Amino acid sequence: MESFVAMKVVCITVLFVIVAVNESATSEARTSSAAKETKKKNVTLHFPSYIRNPQKLALELLEICKNNKSRNSLPSTNYSAINDKYVDFKNCTFLCKHAEDRNVTLDLPPNTLCGPNGETCAEKSKCVGHIPGC
């Protein structure tokens, strides 16, 4: 009987932890202005497995893309986009799209992981990019 009660306590504790983690992630996403503007939720990003939080990186790159548009005085359209297929972890660059015919290649932030052993874009020569099958 004691083990049954203990099992219930463990299950309830696990449930609370799952709810707390989910709530924490939800509120963090709400605070990001880029996240508020993202129309799709539950997007699957195809980044290498060493990228621990793909959605956070994608939102950061989208913000860099938007800031680049305003710095370069491009026409004020609300369109800025990135595509996970055009993020080059080997060269630490990504493609930023401002309109149908206006693309620019930008640098990934220096602290972006670019290899499975903690390599970052701060030292591009050590980057290994995407490892097939991983």
From Swiss-Prot:
It is found in: Secreted. It comes from the Eukaryota. This is Salivary protein 15 Iric-1. GO terms for cellular component: extracellular region. Induction: By feeding. By the presence of Borrelia burgdorferi. Its main location: secreted. Salivary tick protein that downregulates host immune system by binding to both dendritic cells, and CD4(+) T cells. Specifically binds to the CD4 coreceptor on T cells. This interaction prevents the activation of the Src kinase, Lck, and its downstream substrate Zap-70, and results in deficient activation of PLCgamma1, the repression of calcium fluxes triggered by T-cell antigen receptor (TCR) ligation, and a subsequent reduction in interleukin-2 production. (Microbial infection) Protects Borrelia garinii (strain VSBP) from host complement-mediated killing by binding to the surface of spirochetes and preventing deposition of host C5b-9 membrane attack complexes. Protects Borrelia garinii (strain A87S) from host complement-mediated killing.
